[in-house]
Amino acid sequence: EGYENNFPANIRPQGHDIIRTWAFYTTLRCLALTGKKPFDDIVINGMVFGEDGYKMSKSRGNVIAPDEVIEQYGADALRTWAANSVPGSDVIFDWKDIKHGYRFLRKFWNAFRFISMQIFDEEVSYDEIKGNFDPLDLWILSKLNNLNKVVDNAFANYDFATTITSIEKFIWHDFCDEYIEAVKYRLYLSLIHI
C-alpha cells in the first residue's frame, strides 16, 4: 500500500554533483524493474558554500549546522534563506542573509498582529466590504492578485527564489510600507466616532 501511494514520486531534489550516479542510475533501475520512471520531476540543487567561499565540508571546518541557525533565528529564517537559492546554482551561506530573512519575518508577523488587533468578531458580508473599497484598497488587491499569479507560476517551475522575493517585496513594501501606513487614519477616525 505504501509503495503504490508513493511510487512514482512527484519530485526528487538532487545535487548537481551526483546527477550521473544517483539520478541516472535510479531512473535506469526503476525503468528496468518496474517499467515506470521513479519520479515525475527532478529539481537540481546547487552546493552550499561556507562564508569562506569553499564548499561546506566537515573536514574544512566551515559547516554551519542548521540547529545553530534555528537556535538563533528560528527555522523560518533558515527556510527563507534556503528558498532564495536558484535551482542548479550554488549558494553561499551568509549570516546577513539569515538575519535579513529574520527581519522580514518579524515585519510580516508585526503586520499580521497589527491587523488582527483591528479585526472584530462582527459578521460583515462581502457586499458590505466590497461597497466600501476605495482606490487604495483596489490597488493593494490588484497587487495581491498579481502576486498570486507570479507565485503560482514560480512554484510550477520550482523557482522558489522568485516566490520568496516576490512575497517579500509585496509584504514589506506594498503592504506594510505603503498600504498599512496609508490606511491607518481609518482606524483613528473610527475611534473618534465611537
Q: How does the language model describe each region?
A:
Residues 2, 6-17:
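A short glycine/serine-rich beta->alpha loop
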Residues 13-14, 18, 135, 139:
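Short, surface-exposed alpha-helical recognition segments that flank or form part
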Residues 16-24, 54-58:
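Short linear motifs at secondary-structure transitions and domain/linker junctions
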Residues 19-35:
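Metal-dependent nuclease catalytic cores in nucleic-acid-processing enzymes
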Residues 36-191:
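Long, charged, mostly alpha-helical binding arms that flank functional sites
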